[in-house]
């Protein structure tokens, strides 16, 4: 994937970058694999906002992605590589020998015409899905299951991959893109290779309108609100938040507070948690600069 730059002939194109979409081979999705996508706009069944900053955006049709890869020992051919508006990775359309069609996440370097296979005896090639017990150490994988036969849940974003570190007993140790090291059952499936569209993180939106196209609404700082709307609000002129530490709109501590449940069931499987100190420090500096400047 390459990135296209724009000349600064308008303020909206001054810092705007977009993908060239050079890897896309067709602009029409498979009709049997798309369903209507209903936008909740951050509301629950009573119409109450439960997730702020959501709403609007372009209409989208959801592509049914095969995260389970449970068509074992049936060869499939990559028919096309397509754009998916619901994720930053590309998707690949597979045509199985028995006539079935399915979408999968497009791994890097997988091209049209390639053959992919899923199963314990599949070769170690990009796009093939195997149980973790059958994958050699040091192999890059993505779309990893956390529980057998439940479908891939982690390492699905564009450009990401995990690495097989060790095998012991009924578990396989995997190093995730966040630097977390955790154990996963050896029966869980994963796909060989790195997710494609590796330059997705280098895209610059360039203007607020592109965020609105994505269904993201503006985020207003609490310090500029009224006291009735946010604990940081109020004061005469430009004033500080008036508290010992930042809080959420509902008065709970924010920025630097651990949100993971200390009794979470998966804690014993995490051998090395994510080192969040560096990220939290930078995040707090960023928000304090926004609040006081």
Curated annotation (Swiss-Prot):
Species assigned in the record: Pyropia yezoensis
Gene name of the encoded protein: rpl2
Record's protein name: Large ribosomal subunit protein uL2c
Region (Disordered): 224-245
Subunit structure: Part of the 50S ribosomal subunit.
Intrachain disulfide bonds: none
Database matches in PROSITE patterns: RIBOSOMAL_L2
InterPro entries: NA-bd_OB-fold (IPR012340), Rib_uL2_dom2 (IPR014722), Ribosomal_uL2 (IPR002171), Ribosomal_uL2_bac/org-type (IPR005880), Ribosomal_uL2_C (IPR022669), Ribosomal_uL2_CS (IPR022671), Ribosomal_uL2_dom3 (IPR014726), Ribosomal_uL2_RNA-bd_dom (IPR022666)
Compartments reported by the entry: Plastid, Chloroplast
One GO-annotated biological process of the protein: mitochondrial translation
SMART domains: Ribosomal_L2, Ribosomal_L2_C
Bilayer-crossing regions: none
Keywords: Chloroplast, Plastid, Ribonucleoprotein, Ribosomal protein
Gene3D superfamilies referenced in this protein's UniProt entry, alphabetically: 2.30.30.30, Nucleic acid-binding proteins, Ribosomal protein L2, domain 3
Source species, domain of life: Eukaryota
UniProt-recorded Gene Ontology molecular function terms: rRNA binding; structural constituent of ribosome; transferase activity
Family, similarity comment: Belongs to the universal ribosomal protein uL2 family.
Recorded GO CC terms: chloroplast; mitochondrial large ribosomal subunit
């Amino acid at each position: 994937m390459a990135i296209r730059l724009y000349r600064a002939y308008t303020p909206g194109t001054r810092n705007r970058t977009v993908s060239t979409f050079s890897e896309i081979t067709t602009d029409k999705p498979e009709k049997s694999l798309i369903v209507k996508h209903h936008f909740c706009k951050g509301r629950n069944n009573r119409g109450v906002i439960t997730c702020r900053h959501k709403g609007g955006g372009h209409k989208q049709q959801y592509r049914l992605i095969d995260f389970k890869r449970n068509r074992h020992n049936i060869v499939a051919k990559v028919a096309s590589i397509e754009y998916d508006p619901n994720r930053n990775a590309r998707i690949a359309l597979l045509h199985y020998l028995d006539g079935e069609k399915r979408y999968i996440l497009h791994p890097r370097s997988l091209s049209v015409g390639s053959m992919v296979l899923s199963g314990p005896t599949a070769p170690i090639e990009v796009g093939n899905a195997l149980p973790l017990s059958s994958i050699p150490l040091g192999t890059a994988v993505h779309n990893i299951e956390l529980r057998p036969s439940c479908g891939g849940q982690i390492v699905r974003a564009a450009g990401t991959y995990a690495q097989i570190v060790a095998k012991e007993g009924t578990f396989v140790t995997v190093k995730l893109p966040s630097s977390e090291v955790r154990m996963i059952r050896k029966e869980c499936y994963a796909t060989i290779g790195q997710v494609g569209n590796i330059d997705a993180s280098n895209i610059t939106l360039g203007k607020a309108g592109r965020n609105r196209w994505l269904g993201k609404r503006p985020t207003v700082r609490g310090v500029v609100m009224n006291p009735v709307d946010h604990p940081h609000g109020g004061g005469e002129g430009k004033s500080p938040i008036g508290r010992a530490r930042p809080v959420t709109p509902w008065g709970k501590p924010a920025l630097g507070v651990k949100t993971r449940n200390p009794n979470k069931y998966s804690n014993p499987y995490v051998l090395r948690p994510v080192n969040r100190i560096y990220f939290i420090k930078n995040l707090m500096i960023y928000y304090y600069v926004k609040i006081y400047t």
